[in-house]
UniProtKB/Swiss-Prot annotation:
Modified residues (N6-(pyridoxal phosphate)lysine): K236
NCBIfam families, sorted: DAPAT_plant
SUPFAM superfamilies: PLP-dependent transferases (SSF53383)
UniProt name for this protein: LL-diaminopimelate aminotransferase
Keyword Transferase appears in the UniProt entry: yes
Reaction(s) the record says it catalyses: (2S,6S)-2,6-diaminopimelate + 2-oxoglutarate = (S)-2,3,4,5-tetrahydrodipicolinate + L-glutamate + H2O + H(+)
Organism per entry: Chlamydia trachomatis serovar D (strain ATCC VR-885 / DSM 19411 / UW-3/Cx)
């Protein structure tokens, strides 16, 4: 059997797996130090009681011969699709356009597989590493990095003379923590329509947006229905990281160049490749949507971001993002240190594990990412260490 040639283009280790190995090695060699890990975007707050109760009740029903059930609908429970349409999208996305999945990352893989190999895929730089790896694994003909630089407020720079088939766009952004406003998002949508580009819009952090003027969905721009697909997740807002539940929106108006409707092929694709997300997870998701606007976990993580920002600014770092996302994009000021050494510096001097920006792409060079998804006691301890230890010096 021949090896899949696309694996040749991957790095040996996935970024976050490699970081955890380095943290484990440091702990082994320095048992006297307690490492605070702010490198991974993993949730730390427990499930809301009503969500946990819905989950447990659903599992209990599966244990009874009178209420147990087998496969659920391929496209998701009607109750969950309808509640997302009414409560999350306020009716501007129809329930039939919402497809429930087992997570945003796997949906990204499904979508790029669905559209087939030999596509030219554009990705923000810096960006979540899975975009690049999945584009490679699914046989992208060309992958174009769109620089998102500090001097341009991390807004992507689009090429003038290169055709793009698919644009992966994330807002609120991972890793920069910044969010596109309506004018910026509208400009990207119109650019996509003009250049016949499909946007895969990752809105996994949209529930962190607190400013009502900022778009939580690309479909707040009406024309996006002709050029975009949206991916979202229950992982961060509801603490479903280990439960796995997400969704994808395919607008009914979206067509291929030949006029055929994408949603028809997507339904056929899912019927063949997917038997539906976990029923207990979906029923817990219905309960979670009822409390989402008042969810304490989101406020908790926002407060973590505020604490980290104040400590980092007081220590002499430049800080971006974090207001509408659980990530802070941090730049050491007056420093002359290589990207390779940034991770080791924070681990050695502060005993804090962060993510070096270069791991998210070339344009991440010189930055590091802090996650605010940790426990409050760890965030407070990290803030204390940042203020006591020496800042980077040139």
């Amino acid at each position: 059997m021949k090896r899949n040639p696309h694996f040749v283009s991957l790095t040996k280790n996935y970024l976050f797996a490699d970081l955890q190995k380095r943290v484990a090695q440091f702990r082994l060699e320095n048992p006297q130090h307690t490492v605070i890990n702010l490198s991974i975007g993993d949730t730390t707050q427990p499930l809301n009681a009503s969500v946990a109760e819905a989950f447990a009740s659903s599992i209990a029903r599966l244990s009874s011969p009178t209420t147990c059930r087998g496969y659920g609908p391929d496209f998701g429970l009607p109750a969950l699709r309808q509640k997302l349409s009414e409560d999350f999208y306020r009716g501007f996305v129809d329930a039939k356009e919402i497809f429930i999945s087992d997570g945003a990352k796997v949906d990204l893989f499904r979508l790029l597989s669905f559209f087939g190999p030999n596509q030219t895929v554009a990705i923000q730089d810096p960006s979540y590493p899975a975009y690049l790896d999945i584009a490679r694994l699914t046989g992208a003909k060309e992958i174009i990095a769109l620089p998102c630089l500090q001097e341009n407020a991390f807004f992507p720079e689009f090429p003038e003379d290169t055709h793009i088939d698919i644009l992966c766009l994330c807002s609120p952004n991972n890793p920069t923590g910044t969010v596109l406003n309506k004018d910026q998002l509208r400009a990207i949508v119109h650019y996509a329509i003009e250049h016949e580009i499909l946007i895969l819009f990752d809105a996994a952090y949209s529930t962190f947006i607190s400013d009502p003027s900022l778009p939580k969905s690309i479909f707040e721009i009406p024309d996006a229905r002709f050029c975009a697909i949206e991916i979202n997740s229950f992982s961060k807002p509801l603490g479903f990281a280990g439960i796995r539940l997400g969704w994808t929106v395919i607008p009914q108006e979206l067509t291929y160049a030949d006029g055929h409707f994408v949603i028809q092929d997507w339904e056929r694709f899912l019927s063949t490749t997917f038997n539906g997300a976990s029923i207990p997870a979906q029923e817990a998701g219905v309960a979670g949507l009822s409390i989402l606007p008042q969810l304490e976990a989101i406020h908790y993580y926002r407060e973590n971001s505020d604490l980290l920002r104040k400590a980092l600014l007081a220590t002499g770092f430049e800080v971006f993002g974090g207001e509408h996302a659980p990530y802070l994009w941090v730049k050491p000021t007056q420093a002359n240190i290589s990207d390779r050494d940034l991770f080791d510096f924070f681990l050695r001097e502060y005993h804090i594990a962060i993510t070096p920006g270069i791991g998210f792409g070339r344009s991440g060079s010189g930055f590091v990412r802090f996650s605010s998804l940790g426990k409050r006691e760890d965030i407070l301890a990290a803030c204390e260490r940042l203020q006591m230890a020496p800042a980077l010096q040139s």
